[in-house]
A protein has these predicted regions:
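Conserved anion/nucleotide-ligand pocket segment
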Residues: 34-56
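Conserved N-proximal alpha/beta basic substrate-recognition cap immediately N-terminal to
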Residues: 1-16, 25-31, 37-38
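Internal nucleotide-binding/catalytic subdomain
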Residues: 49-190
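Short beta-strand/turn micro-motifs at beta-sheet edges
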Residues: 113-115, 219-221, 270-277
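Active-site "cap" helix and flanking loop/linker of ATP-utilizing ligase/carboxylase catalytic domains
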Residues: 142-164, 181-261, 272
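Short, conserved charged micro-motifs
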Residues: 25-26, 58-61, 242-244, 292-299
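Generic C-terminus detector
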Residues: 269-274, 278-325
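Short amphipathic alpha-helical segments
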Residues: 47-49, 231, 281-286
């Protein structure tokens, strides 16, 4: 709700919305919208606090669940939005409150199943750069979102420093903000790190201390140099995004991570008493690769997954499909 109010104040394009703590008022707001309806828990809900309800009945049931504590304190307040039709992308800005550096756009895959089916997750894979975000659209996001938000926050006495995650929907009317996060995305961060040409720590330190200077860090990720495509595929434990089954042994990770351009980031892993890696969370591994083109990066990532001895692992087989098609 705070973010939506700031966007309204600064003229940043986003979906029409309302904020509610009362079921009756929330149901009344549904009368002003047409299905599908977007319902968001106002607080942090591990990436699962957004529900797209296809019918009025589903929306009413879901909003009642949320306001009665489905996500604990995170859904004590509910944001209801009009549905935006389009393709989504993630844009990351690193800023000290005045100066900023925009990273290449990434695109993640929220649904658990191939073809974007099944329930929402924290993200089952990502790739960058995302072709849907053309240079023209990136410029519009900078002018219509990044600059107004940073200037507005600073002008209101609360300059924003750090990583600003801008979730954008590319609609027929242009880019509109779906959400902001005060962090990198997971798994988008993994692909962006693979594209970095130098250590990102000095940039983050400069952002946090207000010491960024224009163009000082441009060599980290030259926007005009077409950074190599990168992809990450999340391998999850069975049961995710519900209750994940923990404890299954994962073998051959060392060998699998030695392919050209491949890096495996651990997420939900642990070591058992014998020193074996085991599944210890929902999203367990991020198998990440770069390539001369996206197809090569995708092939490398899936080849690495094929080397991992973990039959219980669950993953999508179509990461990057929008760009590849």
């Amino acid at each position: 709700g705070f973010a939506k109010d700031r966007m309204a104040a600064y003229g940043v394009p986003t979906a029409r919305y309302g904020r509610f703590t009362d079921v009756a008022a929330a149901k009344a707001f549904l009368d002003t919208l047409t299905a599908p309806f977007v319902l968001k828990a106002d607080g942090l809900a591990a990436g699962k606090g957004v529900v797209i309800a296809e019918t009025r009945e589903e929306a009413e049931a879901e909003l009642a669940d949320m306001l009665s504590g489905k996500f604990g304190g995170a859904s004590a307040e509910l944001v209801i939005e009009e549905f935006m039709e389009g393709e989504e992308a993630s844009i990351f800005v690193i800023t000290d409150g005045i100066n900023y550096l925009t990273l290449p756009a990434a695109q993640d895959h929220k649904r658990i199943g191939d073809g974007d089916t099944g329930p929402n997750t924290g993200g089952m894979g990502a790739y960058a750069p995302a072709p849907v975000m053309t240079p023209e659209l990136m410029k519009r996001v900078e002018e219509e979102v990044t600059v107004p938000m940073l200037r507005g926050m600073a002008g209101d006495g609360m300059p924003y420093r750090g990583v600003l995650y801008i979730g954008v929907m590319v609609t027929p009317d242009g880019p509109k903000v779906v959400e902001f996060n005060c962090r990198f995305g997971d798994p988008e961060c993994q692909v962006l790190m693979m594209q970095m040409e130098a250590d990102i720590v000095p940039l983050l330190l400069a952002a946090s201390t207000g010491g960024m200077r224009a163009n000082e860090f441009a060599q980290l990720l030259p926007m005009d140099a077409n950074p190599k495509p990168a992809v990450t595929v999340v391998v999850a434990a069975p049961g995710y995004p519900g209750t994940p089954e923990k404890g299954s042994v994962i073998r051959n990770l060392h060998h699998a991570g030695h392919g050209d351009g491949v890096m495996i980031f651990h997420a939900g892993t642990a070591l058992d008493a014998d020193g074996n890696f085991i599944a210890n969370g929902g999203r367990v591994l991020n198998v990440t690769a770069t390539g001369e083109n996206l197809r090569e990066a995708v092939d490398r990532a899936y080849a690495a997954i094929g080397e991992i001895d973990w039959p219980e692992g669950v993953y999508r087989r179509d990461i990057g499909w929008r760009a590849l098609n």
